[in-house]
Amino acid sequence: MEKMLLKSTTRHVRIFTADVINNDLVFHPNKLTLDLDPDNEFIWNEDSLKKVNQRFTELVQERAGKSLDDYELRKIGSEIEGLIKYLLQNGLLSYNPECRVMNYSMGLPKTKEVL
């Protein structure tokens, strides 16, 4: 029986049980691929990207030996969403004003005028 590619999708995080080969997702039972902020809602700097990728790696390593099922993928995606919100609320990440749709999905920006 052929294995099926699993994915977990949140607003800003997509995780696949796949490897990227020639820009295509190819099922891999022991590999996770992260697609971060597919709608370009945020402006990312190297430090923020590093923090997210490092946390993703930690979460994957914590699950070494466990089945990569829908539940585990959703837990990882939720953790990464929480980190993105933390980065945004602490000024380490900002909304992209040129995003296709400005909906402030993680809350309104905090500015001195609002505080």
From Swiss-Prot:
It is a peripheral membrane protein. One of its GO terms (cellular component) is plasma membrane-derived thylakoid membrane. Its main location: membrane. It is found in: Cellular thylakoid membrane. It catalyses: a plastoquinone + NADH + (n+1) H(+)(in) = a plastoquinol + NAD(+) + n H(+)(out); a plastoquinone + NADPH + (n+1) H(+)(in) = a plastoquinol + NADP(+) + n H(+)(out). NDH-1 shuttles electrons from an unknown electron donor, via FMN and iron-sulfur (Fe-S) centers, to quinones in the respiratory and/or the photosynthetic chain. The immediate electron acceptor for the enzyme in this species is believed to be plastoquinone. Couples the redox reaction to proton translocation, and thus conserves the redox energy in a proton gradient. Cyanobacterial NDH-1 also plays a role in inorganic carbon-concentration. NDH-1 can be composed of about 15 different subunits; different subcomplexes with different compositions have been identified which probably have different functions. This is NAD(P)H-quinone oxidoreductase subunit M. The gene is ndhM.
